[in-house]
Amino acid sequence: HFLFRPRLDLLAGLLAAGGRLIYETFAVGNEAYGKPSNPAFLLRPDELFRLARRTGLVVAGYEHGVTDRQQPALVQRLAAVRPPFDPESIPLVGPMDRRGVR
């Protein structure tokens, strides 16, 4: 759970064809729930989704919302794949519930 923006595009670019990126970290609004609260370390709205589109990844799942597994937090989650890939190999799932569970 650490955001270092200067390396986000590089991280996505390191994926080989069929490679998968699963990423979760805190988003703007998390200040209401605790740390991190520094905007430099909080994702902007749809930032992970835009990263995937900008770097040519296919989004298998994206979420932005509150979870309270250990304590409430506002997070973004992304599951994406570098094409080409077999679409049947990626199970699509529904959004998380309040506990962060599908």
Stretches with model-predicted labels:
Residues 33-36:
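Short acidic, glycine/proline-rich loop/turn micro-motifs
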Residues 39-63, 76:
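Short alpha-helix
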Residues 18-30:
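Conserved beta-strand signature within the Rossmann-like core of class I S-adenosyl-L-methionine
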Residues 3, 27, 63, 84:
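Short, flexible active-site-adjacent loop segments at beta-strand->alpha-helix junctions, enriched
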Residues 2-15:
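A short, conserved alpha-helix within the catalytic core of class I
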Residues 1, 38:
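Short gly/ser-rich anion-binding loops that grip negatively charged ligand groups
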Residues 64-102:
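Core SAM-dependent methyltransferase catalytic element
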